[in-house]
Amino acid sequence: MKSICVFAGSAKGVRESYSKSAKNLGFEIAKREFSMVYGGGSKGLMGIVADAALEGGATVTGVITERLHDVEVGHNNLTSLEIVPSMHDRKARMAELSDAIISLPGGVGTWEEFFEALAWNQLGIYSKPIILFDVDGYYSKLFEFTQFSVEEGFLPESTLAVSYTHLRAHETLRYLVC
């Protein structure tokens, strides 16, 4: 395991625990000498996790579209920032550069990144670990819905084995190195 892709919101959310967990995850990535790949923004949980990883000494690569670079204010202090033409190119590049994906809380963009990675896994395109970092139960309703989808016959049981959930940064990363 060398490089972790982090999906995260461009907002901080209302709970302080979201920011604290993003910061802890960034520090843990650096502490374990992983590099980090993420969406390249400087705001919200994205910016917090990147800043913490950088502060801890990690190499951090941002991948952002030209349009989002202007909207989200691309992070200017990264080890490297790649600007790509489309959202699809952004997700494909982040997946290509990483050995695992961790999804922090976020909105529609974060969900879409997570679900596309999950779909790629189901189709055999992406075979690396995909982890939901379930801060304060943020993803608990999603887990319930996923189980319901399995019960209703729309999702194979094997999909549940692909994504794991952890409640603390050190547990999340310990899982990846075991």
Residue ranges and their predicted role:
Residues 121-127, 154-155:
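Arginine/glycine-rich "motif VI" loop of SF2 helicases in the C-terminal RecA-like domain
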Residues 177-178:
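Hydrophobic alpha-helical segments, chiefly the membrane-spanning helices
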Residues 39, 104, 132, 166:
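Active-site-adjacent beta-strand anchor residues
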Residues 1-97, 136-164:
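A cross-family phosphate/adenosyl-ligand binding-site feature
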Residues 105, 124-134:
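Short, proline-centered helix/strand-breaking motifs
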Residues 12, 43-44, 108-110, 173:
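Glycine-rich nucleotide phosphate-binding loop and flanking beta-alpha elements
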Residues 91-123:
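Active-site/ligand-binding-proximal alpha/beta "capping" segment
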Residues 165-172:
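Conserved small/polar residues in nucleotide/adenosyl-binding loops
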